Regions:
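Short glycine-rich anion-binding loops that position phosphate/pyrophosphate groups of nucleotides
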Residues: 3-5, 63-66, 159
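N-terminal extracellular/periplasmic Venus flytrap/periplasmic-binding protein-like
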Residues: 126-190
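Conserved catalytic cysteine-centered active-site region
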Residues: 2-58, 90-92, 103-109, 176-190
Length: 190
């Protein structure tokens, strides 16, 4: 799964990864792009294919580097136009489609989150309380060994001078997250 395909991995990072890993050209690669949860979508697609008897072994996961998302130039709105618009593709639509945005808006996922919170009356305090509780539940599950069978440890090179780093767990959850710490974070939008 990959959200914002750009760079040297081209548009089909799954195929590139399979070939560069030494898989024969007869092994297909399929990149899933559903924006949020692309990696999880790839895992679900693989599980579904195994369940349906379409194969016995699938390699699935997610890759993303939003910091490398490109700035892009939209097409001119009229012939010989000199008013090129540049779009930051890190968050939001790469090339806004006016028909779509006029009907549905052009909100990014964080903006949509704020809109939903406003619509349902979810305060910042309630959101931070939920987020802190979610982090605490993850930490308790991790300490109980709940995730031990779900992540296969891998070694990642750190260059010639350092030994490989062993990756054994998800990097995002933060054991130190508290309501107080979260409430000090500046909101992205007002």
């Amino acid at each position: 799964g990959s959200t914002n395909q750009a760079g040297e991995d081209s548009r089909n990072v799954a195929r590139f990864a399979a070939l560069l890993a030494g898989m024969p050209v007869t092994v297909p690669g399929q990149t899933v792009n559903r924006l949020c949860a692309s990696g999880l979508g790839a895992v679900i697609d693989s599980a579904r294919a195994i369940t349906a008897g379409e194969g016995e072994l699938y390699i699935a996961g997610g890759v993303e580097s939003m910091t490398r998302a490109p700035f892009v130039m939209g097409k001119a709105e009229s012939a010989y136009s000199r008013d090129a618009k540049i779009y930051d593709t890190t968050i939001g639509t790469r090339f806004p489609n006016r028909k779509f945005t006029d009907q549905f808006g052009a909100h990014s996922m964080p903006e949509t989150g704020d809109n939903v919170a406003e619509e349902f009356g979810i305060s910042r305090e309630q959101a931070d309380t939920f987020a802190a509780a979610s982090q605490a539940k993850y930490q308790a599950a991790k300490e109980a060994g709940f995730f031990e069978g779900e992540i296969t440890p891998i070694e990642v090179s750190q260059g010639r001078k350092l030994p490989p780093k062993q990756i054994t767990e998800d990097e995002h959850p933060r054991a130190s997250s508290t309501f107080e710490a979260l409430s000090k974070l500046k909101p992205l939008f007002e």
